[in-house]
Amino acid sequence: MKEKRRDSKGRILHTGESQRTDGKYLYKYVDAFGNTKYVYAWRLTPTDPTPKGKREKPSLRELEQQIRRDIEDGIDSTGKKMTLCQLYAKQNAQRANVKKSTQKQREQLMRLLKEDKLGARSIDTIKPSDAKEWALRMKDKGFSYNTINNHKRSLKASFYIAIQDDCVRKNPFNFKLSEIIENDTKEKVALTEEQEQALLSFIKTDNVYHKYYDDVLILLKTGLRISELCGLTVADIDFKNEVVVIDHQLLKSKEQGYYIETPKTKSGIRQVPLSRETIQAFQRVMKKRPKAEPFVIDGRGNFLFVNHKGKPKVAIDYNMLFVRMVKKYNKHHKDNPLPHITPHTLRHTFCTRLASKNMNPKDLQYIMGHSNISITMNWYAHASIDTAKSEVQRLIA
């Protein structure tokens, strides 16, 4: 009968186990893919003391138990050792055809992962507590709740790929961020009808800002995203059918300059109905466009909203415009100031106004270009005391 192998303490070693001359234990095995692998440990069992000067790590028998479980579950022993950065890069490579804005967000997250200790960790060692600590570090660095939540969503998607590929069993990013970090995102508030009229009246009569009256009116009466408004050309206004055709947006970056992009989602491609007031505003815009050299971007020209040099305006131009405009208004109306207003505030106001008038949700979803009806339905939940009063009066009259 063949004598069983023993370690330096006289203990019988199991199949695949051995002990080197320096005292370190070794386990040889074949993984789920037929590859020969080795693991090492200074301790044979969990109760063995760690040799002096050596790091505290799992014993060989603990490693064997994990290996057997991985083999039984078909876990990829190589794949689980990839770092979080490598996993995120793998996910991005599988979905390479994305918008430039999405690509910039990806680059930001990859840069953050490389700067953070979590990025170099192998994915099989990342626990929910590690993911939560990462979120807290992002908060300490000054990132907003929404930014952290978006990055968390991306990493959660990455781990689902790892689960599907049998690299890990669980998703450490499958938790609610609001349980870790307070959601301090300010609720977007629509302008009241009085504020809307006050803004329009001020712009119309102001000697500086009157030239932007039509821009603001069109935003208020169409609910367009600011990048969609900036991208409008003469050909996009269909006066015969009284609609504006939305099939692109105009953006600008430091790296690339001006560029044309498709709408935010497929639902963003739409035709927005125009009121008589809005049609007249578009006609005035066309009439007062400065005569300048043709400016063509990605094959599109004759942009409607341009500066004095004939170059198209972009979102940042309007953002700064609204800051200055509201500041001047509030300087002369200290008793009844306007809130902080952005171009998106006007889109929010347009949607809220139609929702409060009980427009068919599916029709409003189409006009707004929302990809999901749940986004549209949120606006119907934004009741105010004024709309509540009118509804009560209507129902009990």
Predicted regions and their residues:
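Short, basic (Lys/Arg/His-rich) helix/loop patches that form interaction surfaces
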Residues: Y145, S201-Y212, V272, K288-F303, ...
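Short, aromatic/basic-rich helix-turn unit that serves as a nucleic-acid recognition element
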Residues: I12, N35-V39, P46-K52, T83-R111, ...
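Short, Arg/Lys-rich segments that mark the N-terminal edge of DNA/RNA- and chromatin-recognition modules
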Residues: M1-L44, H248
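Basic/aromatic-enriched alpha-helical hairpins
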Residues: R69-I75, Q86-G142, S158-I161
